[in-house]
C-alpha cells in the first residue's frame, strides 16, 4: 500500500493555436536564463567583463544542445535505429533526450574557441560558470517530470511518483505528448527528483567552497564535474528506462565513474589559489582602474574582482 505519492503533471505540452508550448523546452530555457544571470555576477566578481558571458552563451547554448542530442542518440541508439523505429525521431529534440556530457563537451569546446579568439584565459570563466551549470541542470530536470521520463523501479515509498496513462487526441498512447486519463499506471522512484536535489546540493557546495577556499585555475569546474558524476553514478543505477549496456552495466554509469576519477585527479593537479583580475582580463581590469581614477565625485568605483563574495584583489 502506498501511503502518499507525488503526482505527475497531467500533460507536458500545451497549445497556443497551432503552436506547441513544451514544458521540457521551457525548463531548459529557464535554466539557461538563470545560468547566464549567475555567471555574469560570478565572472564579474573574478575581474572579468560580464558582457563576455552573453557572447559566450550565444555560442555555447546551441553547441551544447547539439552536443547533448548527439550524445543521447549515440548512447540510446536503440530508440531511433531499429526495425520499428523512425530515425527521423532522432531530430525531435522537443520530445526530450539530451545527454549532459555531450552538452558539456561540445558546449565547452565552443566556449574554448571563443575565449581563444578573445585571447582570454578559459579557467576563470569555467570556474564562474560551474555552479550556474549545475543549477541549470537541476532546473532542467523538472522537464523530465513533465515528460514522465527517467524514473526508477516501482515502489511504495511515501515520495513515489505517479505515472499516468496519457493519450493523444485520437486516444492513442502518448506518454510524452499526450494528456492524462487519470489512470495511474505505476508508482515509481522519482530519480529525476533525486538528481535535481543532488544538483542543488552540489550547487551549494560549490558556492561555499569557492568562497571559503578561494578556488581558481579551473578547480571549481573540476569539483563540479566530480560532484555531479558522484551523484549520477548511484542515481543511474536506480533507473529502469532502456539504456545501452556495456558488460551488463549502463553506459552512463561507466562514464560517470571514469569522469569522476579524472576530475578528482585534475582537481589536485591544478594550481591552488585564484587568478587576479589582471590575469582574468587585463584590458577590462585596466579600464575599471581608469574609471575609478576618473570618477567625477571623487569616490573610487568598484574595482574589477569586487563582487558577490565581497573580495578585493588584496584579499585573494
Swiss-Prot record:
<keyword id="KW-0812">Transmembrane</keyword>
<feature type="transmembrane region" description="Helical">
    <location>
        <begin position="18"/>
        <end position="38"/>
    </location>
</feature>
<keyword id="KW-0808">Transferase</keyword>
<dbReference type="InterPro" id="IPR001640">
    <property type="entry name" value="Lgt"/>
</dbReference>
<feature type="transmembrane region" description="Helical">
    <location>
        <begin position="251"/>
        <end position="271"/>
    </location>
</feature>
<keyword id="KW-0472">Membrane</keyword>
<comment type="similarity">
    <text>Belongs to the Lgt family.</text>
</comment>
<protein>
    <recommendedName>
        <fullName>Phosphatidylglycerol--prolipoprotein diacylglyceryl transferase</fullName>
        <ecNumber>2.5.1.145</ecNumber>
    </recommendedName>
</protein>
<feature type="region of interest" description="Disordered">
    <location>
        <begin position="292"/>
        <end position="316"/>
    </location>
</feature>
<keyword id="KW-1003">Cell membrane</keyword>
<dbReference type="GO" id="GO:0008961">
    <property type="term" value="F:phosphatidylglycerol-prolipoprotein diacylglyceryl transferase activity"/>
</dbReference>
<dbReference type="Pfam" id="PF01790">
    <property type="entry name" value="LGT"/>
</dbReference>
<feature type="transmembrane region" description="Helical">
    <location>
        <begin position="188"/>
        <end position="208"/>
    </location>
</feature>
<comment type="function">
    <text>Catalyzes the transfer of the diacylglyceryl group from phosphatidylglycerol to the sulfhydryl group of the N-terminal cysteine of a prolipoprotein, the first step in the formation of mature lipoproteins.</text>
</comment>
<comment type="pathway">
    <text>Protein modification; lipoprotein biosynthesis (diacylglyceryl transfer).</text>
</comment>
<dbReference type="GO" id="GO:0042158">
    <property type="term" value="P:lipoprotein biosynthetic process"/>
</dbReference>
<feature type="transmembrane region" description="Helical">
    <location>
        <begin position="47"/>
        <end position="67"/>
    </location>
</feature>
<feature type="transmembrane region" description="Helical">
    <location>
        <begin position="95"/>
        <end position="115"/>
    </location>
</feature>
<dbReference type="GO" id="GO:0005886">
    <property type="term" value="C:plasma membrane"/>
</dbReference>
<feature type="binding site">
    <location>
        <position position="141"/>
    </location>
    <ligand>
        <name>a 1,2-diacyl-sn-glycero-3-phospho-(1'-sn-glycerol)</name>
    </ligand>
</feature>
<keyword id="KW-1133">Transmembrane helix</keyword>
